Amino acid sequence: MRKIFLDRNENNYGPAPACYKVLENVDQNLFSNYTDAYKRGVKSALSERIAADFNLSEKRVILGYGAEDILKQLVQCYLNPGQKLMIPAFSWWYYKAIADEVGGINLEYPLIKGKDSFHYDIDSMLALAETEKPLLLFLSSPNNPTGNSISTTDLETVLTHMKDTIIALDEAYWYHSKDEHAKHLVNTYPNLVVIRTFSKYYALAGVRIAYALIGENLTRIANLANRYLGFNLIAEKIALAALDSPEYYEDIAKKMKSDKEIYYKELGRIPGFIVFKSDANFILVEIPREIKDSLKNFLTDRGLILKFMNEEFLNTHIRITLGTQEENHLVIETIKEFSSSNSDR
């Protein structure tokens, strides 16, 4: 039986055809040679391209082996033992681990759970920052696993009130969100870092490549992230091919948006289910506690692997990655089948 993994927020459509062509046409130099981008006064062809797209100095674009790598570099660059990092209360578990690795202190700021969506509690966030004076703040937008984004207005409020804190905006899922922060904010706020990955939207998680746009005050991380001998040239070429394939990815985004609406409608009809609105490539669903184990087993027996949350306050929730349209239809119909058979007992 084929297993369908919808628990890791990957893009099951796969990368654009142009990405495969890079591998088909790769030549020896990409394997054997170091980069020569430094001859043009830049770090790489990819950082040069991204800088041009955002009208930034190439020195303010850094590359990393996934967003995880850039977040880790930020913490290791700036956070000393005993210093404080603010993170969302409900978010990626690795945020906590990064500070722990350097002896830092994690401070959790709250999210508010509404009827069918979550949102950041900006007032509580700022009050905590005023009291604790954190060195770093991680903001995830859209946030994993709750799917909510921070509005431009709220983000600017945070940036204005926390001028002495480095604000890392993790936009791993930004292509699926209606808000666009980077282009007009990173030039305005010198303490802002906007982090983006090729893993999610571009379906290149295995390639391990991401980038960040950094505010003008953050020269230390720019120096730390620099690699004199360059980055993975094949990965860079694949990433450039993805950037040159907007129509392919826009078509996938439209399919995912349509499927999200079907999830809201179909799962929202099931008694005891709450489907939360999401700006990302996944949705969060609250289910009755008493069916958690039996539903998980029912889905797993049919080859459907979803993320059943075990975190405090989210331990009756499922995070469902948006797969292909066929996969999404199968998940919905299987959950409806379980619900129907369960209600007949």
Q: Model-derived features: where do they sit?
A:
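PLP-dependent aminotransferase class I/II
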Residues: G14-A16, V102, N191-R269, I274-F276
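PLP-dependent aminotransferase-like
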Residues: C77-L135, L139
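Short acidic capping loops at alpha-helix termini that bridge into adjacent secondary structure
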Residues: S57-V61, G82-K84, E171, P190-N191, ...
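Conserved PLP-binding catalytic core of the aspartate aminotransferase-like
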Residues: K257, L267-R302, I318, L322
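Active-site phosphate-binding strand-loop segment of PLP-dependent enzymes
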Residues: G114-Y173
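PLP-dependent enzyme catalytic core of the Aspartate aminotransferase-like
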Residues: T153, N297, D301-R302, L306-K307, ...
